[in-house]
Amino acid sequence: MKVLFKKLKDGARLPEKATAGSAAYDLYTAEDIIIWQGRQIIPLGFAMEMEDGYEALIDPRSGFSSKGMEGYLVVDYVVETNGYRIEGTIGKFTSMTPSRFDCDVIEGKIDSDYRDGVGVIVCNRDSRAFLIKAGTRIAQMTFHKVETVEWEEVEELSETNREGGFGSTGTK
């Protein structure tokens, strides 16, 4: 399948596989970005076009999921200029040694008819803001065929031995 890639920011990188056997394409940050507490979208600096009948899924990288997201601690500060307070200004970094933060990539979906900029949703549960540098592998993308289904409303469904759902079969 051919996927068209349109750069929206100079720092945008083409998604690429880390190894020949990789199932997913790594996604990179296009510029330095501060990750504040809570949810936010990290723009990747590109748009794409894929064939009809497919979707792209954005997933976390396993290292970030198991160890926390890598970044650089930011110290917030307030700037006062001519009597005005400017809060939330990008702070200075306490260290250029990376740390791990309690921040996760939230799974996302891209439909085949979406043409705007691609972004990664993150949720920072850490109380500290941190910087992710441009070129950081932030998430991964896979492509999947989407089937069109025909729905039919019925009064009854066929019976099975299953019931309960949501963990009802246990863990062992």
Identify the residue ranges that each predicted region occupies:
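DUTPase catalytic domain/fold
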Residues: 1-172
